[in-house]
């Protein structure tokens, strides 16, 4: 048949190419053998980890789930309205009890879920897929998202990394982004991953309260309210009350999309920022170090 002829032709061309390029053939052989070893190693780990995750999911203390999910079956009536609600489904990935508590108390229980991390997650750069199953938090997160076998069963349209705006919070963001880029890059490519922007300052007087997301906004608010308004700097998400937090994850939510540019450069990108601490990276940090100054006395 035509397909057999085509397959035979391709096999012959590939065979000729590999004979002419022994280095490529050797690299391909090693890669195939490595994949086979990883596949066998992963099979046993997956079975054990999935059994643990199923038990944990029944009483998953890390997940405060919502009522509607992206992968829910459509109802017989009001399909368009239900699809619109599904597009709003969001899971906030937070760190620590105080931050997750504030979001949990102020969220929309129909469409907003909360997954709480315990401290900083593992740096998964350079790890194989087995770490997703061996690391309890990653395994539970994978099951909460329902992405083990692909994105078809994804339970939330928006995956929002919600961390403090300090150095530790930024590090946790990078660790989570590394996890998604390393093992689930399609989540990023298809626009499902975001960073939650939360205000750094609250500027208020007796008549008005203004929330500011950077120093420039703070200066403008201070000038607008005049007469020495009260200025509060939020050091962490846990310092924002649930009543206030509801404003920042509601209709006026500010989300920064995680965008992956076209090209096969994920590993190079992650290697530079999340790999070994090279002299090149040390020089970059020294040359680009910025000290934050409060511009208003």
Task: List where the protein language model places each region.
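Short hinge/gating elements
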Residues: 1-2, 62-63, 124-128, 158-166, ...
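GHKL-family ATPase ATP-binding module
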Residues: 1-2, 6-120, 151, 158, ...
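Alpha-helical scaffold elements adjacent to nucleotide-binding pockets in ATP/GTP-utilizing enzyme cores
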Residues: 9, 13, 137-140, 171-179, ...
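Glycine-rich loop/turn
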Residues: 62-82, 205-236
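Hydrophobic alpha-helix feature that most strongly marks membrane-spanning transmembrane helices
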Residues: 68, 146, 150, 161, ...
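Conserved structured catalytic cores and adjacent interaction surfaces
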Residues: 83-84, 98-100, 105-204, 208-210
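Conserved phosphate/anionic-ligand binding catalytic regions in large, soluble enzymes, centered on
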Residues: 90-107, 166-175, 235-253
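C-terminal or mid-to-C-terminal helical accessory/interaction module adjacent to the motor/catalytic core
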Residues: 215-271, 283
């Amino acid at each position: 048949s035509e397909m057999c002829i085509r397959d035979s032709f391709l096999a012959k061309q590939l065979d000729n190419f590999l004979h002419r390029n022994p280095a490529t053939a050797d690299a391909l052989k090693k890669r195939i053998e490595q994949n086979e070893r990883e596949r066998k190693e992963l099979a046993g780990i997956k079975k054990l980890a999935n059994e643990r995750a199923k038990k944990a999911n029944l009483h998953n203390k890390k997940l405060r789930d919502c009522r509607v999910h992206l992968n829910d079956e459509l109802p017989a009536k009001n399909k368009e309205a239900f699809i619109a609600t599904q597009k709003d489904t969001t899971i906030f990935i937070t760190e620590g009890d105080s931050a997750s508590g504030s979001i949990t108390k102020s969220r929309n229980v129909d469409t907003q879920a909360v997954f709480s991390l315990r401290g900083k997650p593992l740096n998964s750069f350079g790890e194989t897929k087995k770490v997703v199953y061996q690391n309890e938090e990653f395994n539970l997160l994978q099951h909460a998202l329902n992405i083990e076998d692909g994105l078809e069963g994804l339970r939330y349209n928006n995956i929002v990394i919600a961390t403090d705006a300090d150095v530790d919070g930024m590090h946790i963001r990078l660790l989570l982004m590394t996890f998604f880029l390393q093992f689930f890059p399609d989540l990023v490519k298809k626009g499902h991953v975001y960073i939650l922007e939360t205000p750094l300052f609250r500027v208020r007087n007796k008549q008005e309260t203004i929330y500011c997301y950077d120093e420039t906004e703070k200066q403008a608010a201070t000038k607008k309210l005049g007469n020495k308004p009260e200025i509060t700097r939020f050091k962490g998400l846990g310092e924002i009350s649930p009543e206030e937090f509801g404003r920042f994850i509601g209709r006026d939510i500010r989300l920064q999309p995680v965008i992956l540019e076209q090209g096969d450069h994920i590993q190079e990108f992650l290697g530079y920022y999340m790999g070994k601490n090279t002299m090149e990276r040390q020089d970059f940090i020294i040359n680009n170090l910025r000290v934050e100054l409060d511009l208003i006395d």
